[in-house]
Amino acid sequence: MFPEKFLWGVAQSGFQFEMGDKLRRNIDTNTDWWHWVRDKTNIEKGLVSGDLPEEGINNYELYEKDHEIARKLGLNAYRIGIEWSRIFPWPTTFIDVDYSYNESYNLIEDVKITKDTLEELDEIANKREVAYYRSVINSLRSKGFKVIVNLNHFTLPYWLHDPIEARERALTNKRNGWVNPRTVIEFAKYAAYIAYKFGDIVDMWSTFNEPMVVVELGYLAPYSGFPPGVLNPEAAKLAILHMINAHALAYRQIKKFDTEKADKDSKEPAEVGIIYNNIGVAYPKDPNDSKDVKAAENDNFFHSGLFFEAIHKGKLNIEFDGETFIDAPYLKGNDWIGVNYYTREVVTYQEPMFPSIPLITFKGVQGYGYACRPGTLSKDDRPVSDIGWELYPEGMYDSIVEAHKYGVPVYVTENGIADSKDILRPYYIASHIKMTEKAFEDGYEVKGYFHWALTDNFEWALGFRMRFGLYEVNLITKERIPREKSVSIFREIVANNGVTKKIEEELLRG
């Protein structure tokens, strides 16, 4: 069982949940993903579903209802995202700031953002959206929820990233997202402004959600359905470095401009972390084959170690080989790690795929982890979800243990399953929380568990087909319909601060 102050919550993002109002007053056309999912070429090639986010669940108008549903589940925490493109639908690039540049490694060591800068930003910010997000956060706080605010969940403002043009011009356009160092500077401005406007009601911040997904699927997997859909390892390297750099700058800006405790029991006014997936959950196909073992080690370092060594130790693996590090103390700064866990990876060795990224000597094995056929059994005879992800709860334990190596508090910030018929979800929830308990009992403290998700939502390139919600959503009426078995199981676990013997006997034994 978990302690009394353990955080039980749900997680959501902006783009996936907000849109769907009948009159289309609250759509956000100023984001790269808005343009990406409706691109004719993407739809014709089957890279995206053709579903459109403006047909979505309308959390923008129905947030009070969703908060009340969460309260009745017994939850005490809620993770939300703020959409950069809603706050700044227009460019902030003309607002000048001084910055120091490390010419040896093309990284920005510091950005000088002042109160005058914030006042300039305030003049062009969308006040309606600032007021909206304050209303959302205050709604949560009034119901007793601890709020985590995440600043970036895959999307970028369209004025920074035109993914169609980036693809067609092979990233030579100016609006080329994380390949461009100006995105780093603009992110620092955005983070400073959000801390300035919301610091009085927020104490827990995350800079990014799963930054390596943006990099790997956008620049190394052109058929993934993620923008900009190019194969360019040099661009991938730049994007990784720039997102590490952006985290570090945002960390310092949030600390600088959020100086007020929102909650009396908070450790400090601003606890700034990062939400991350695939932490230490790559396993060798053959544990007795030294090459497969090394492939798994490289996979784990590429997906999490590369980022974490930089932001926790100030050590940057500039050659992307897992061995050659430079001292970059200006990149150091992170207060907590959010573990997002869904399934494992099983990998085998292959010769380096890209000469400029020596770490990529791993190849996923079909039939395990993320690489399964939906609705079947994996090669390990484990159930597989609607999205084709194997149920492997042991990976939750391993991911928590790996995250603990960096000496900061750990939270489970996403965990869930695409299961439209609610057949596998009850077992999934119970088994993964049980593994979280096991980690806690073994001395690896976990401070919270956030389920993905309260409701069905827009699953990026896959649209509305993948149903992750504890509550089904009718996309016509927007009605929230409980998936009774899972809702009951989760409510009972939350009420008892852990998996009860009754649930264990019903779902986890035999």
Swiss-Prot record:
It holds the Pfam family Glyco_hydro_1. It catalyses: Hydrolysis of terminal non-reducing beta-D-galactose residues in beta-D-galactosides. Keywords: Glycosidase, Hydrolase. PANTHER family: GALACTOLIPID GALACTOSYLTRANSFERASE SFR2, CHLOROPLASTIC, GLYCOSYL HYDROLASE. Belongs to the glycosyl hydrolase 1 family. This enzyme is thermostable. Its EC number is 3.2.1.23. SUPFAM superfamilies: (Trans)glycosidases (SSF51445). GO terms for biological process: carbohydrate metabolic process. Gene3D superfamilies: Glycosidases (3.20.20.80). One of its GO terms (molecular function) is beta-galactosidase activity. It comes from Pyrococcus woesei. The active site is at 210 (proton donor), 414 (nucleophile). This is Beta-galactosidase. The keyword Repeat does not apply.
